[in-house]
Amino acid sequence: MQPIEGIVFDLYGTLYDVHSVVQACESAYPGQGEAISRLWRQKQLEYTWLSSLMGRYASFEQRTEEALRYTCKHLGLATDETTLRQLGQAYLHLAPHPDTTAALRRLKASGLPMAIASNGSHHSIEQVVSHSDMGWAFDHLISVETVKVFKPDNRVYSLAEQTMAIPRDRLLFVSSNSWDATGARHFGFPVCWVNRQGAVFDELGATPTREVRDLGEMSDWLLD
């Protein structure tokens, strides 16, 4: 691996816990919070992938709302616009993983430039980062909105490389999502896969450069 000159992080699942919406889901639908969160995330991802395959880009907020509508229908839950809006807002207030802040502070102190490259819209990324007071960490917030296609399309990874102005073989991509790590690896990034759940990496002809359990371990590997 070439010396690393910058880091690009995925946002949803990597830096922030997408299932921190469980509490909001549970408040709206008692006893269903966990089920809603799991299926909602699954359909959200499926809808972004299908959007790219069909060439029908729409904002992350729209696909997230559509995934929530599906989830509620699938689970037989009555919906109204107020509830849908409130749950959608929960995605703008995601909690960072417990290891995120300390790892980012350590990496920031090293002087490495850092960015987020996310399927979220500019608005979504900015809201999540600002609500958690993490703006200090990042030099760039990169949204697929610029190229109007979702990860793992190569155009998104190319946008990250162009924005950071660092050759791809010196730009570390960090994601907890195996499909995202696979796409980034095929593009040519060295990839650190944050395997929080002890999962199996996808069998799509790529392997991560490094596998870690959390961002603390990632920063140890990169800086020690």
Curated annotation (Swiss-Prot):
(S)-2-haloacid dehalogenases may be used for the biodegradation of halogenated substances and their derivatives which are widely used as pesticides, herbicides and other industrial products. CDD domains: HAD_L2-DEX (cd02588). An (S)-2-haloacid binds at L11, Y12, R41, S118, N119. The active site is at D10. It comes from the Bacteria. InterPro entries: 2-HAD, HAD-like_sf, HAD-SF_hydro_IA, HAD_sf, PGP-like_dom2, S-2-haloacid_dehalogenase. GO terms for molecular function: (S)-2-haloacid dehalogenase activity. It holds the Pfam family Hydrolase. The record marks T14, K151, Y157 as: Important for catalytic activity. Its EC number is 3.8.1.2. It catalyses: an (S)-2-haloacid + H2O = a (2R)-2-hydroxycarboxylate + a halide anion + H(+); (S)-2-chloropropanoate + H2O = (R)-lactate + chloride + H(+). Keywords: Hydrolase, Plasmid. The keyword Cell division does not apply. Residues 175-180 are annotated as: Important for catalytic activity. PANTHER family: HALOACID DEHALOGENASE, TYPE II (AFU_ORTHOLOGUE AFUA_2G07750)-RELATED (PTHR43316:SF3), HYDROLASE, HALOACID DELAHOGENASE-RELATED (PTHR43316). Catalyzes the hydrolytic dehalogenation of small (S)-2-haloalkanoic acids to yield the corresponding (R)-2-hydroxyalkanoic acids. Active with 2-halogenated carboxylic acids and converts only the S-isomer (or L-isomer) of 2-chloropropionic acid with inversion of configuration to produce R-lactate (or D-isomer). Belongs to the HAD-like hydrolase superfamily. S-2-haloalkanoic acid dehalogenase family. This is (S)-2-haloacid dehalogenase H-109. It comes from Pseudomonas putida (Arthrobacter siderocapsulatus).
